[in-house]
Amino acid sequence: MPSFDIVSEIDAVELRNAVENSTRELASRFDFRNVDASFELKEETVKLAAEDDFQLGQMMDILRGNLAKRGVDARAMKAKDSVHIGKNWYKEAEFKQGLEALLAKKIVKLIKDAKIKVQASIQGDKVRVTGKKRDDLQEVMAMLREANLEQPLQYNNFRE
């Protein structure tokens, strides 16, 4: 029986490249001359630091632009509120890996409500979809692309 997995993953290399490109762009921008501002990547969290809250907003725009250039979906990023400590402002942007249980249940419900002849099962941080026909599986993929979910999805492990 044909099957595939629905996952939500981020390419760590592309994320690192986007952060490094953002740092380079920050150094070359005129409005950030003589300003103490930086991007710092630790695992799947990017920490932004600047002297003003307004500058943090500009830095988030720079980061989003570089993520788009590198092919990383910005919907996977969850930005926390700005924090003022001392003379600097800080903001953290966390990148979600894997499907949370609530989102996985929502995906399974969408598939079942579509009345397509496939079975969907939650397996850890992914959803496995199996069906008798390859066309049914492709229909599920198209339906999920159309659905407006809060996290980007990838389809892998396609088996005949």
Swiss-Prot record:
GO terms for molecular function: nucleotide binding. The keyword Nucleotide-binding applies. The keyword Kinase does not apply. Keywords: Nucleotide-binding. One of its GO terms (cellular component) is cytosol. Nucleotide-binding protein. Belongs to the YajQ family. This is Nucleotide-binding protein VC_1508. It comes from Vibrio cholerae serotype O1 (strain ATCC 39315 / El Tor Inaba N16961).
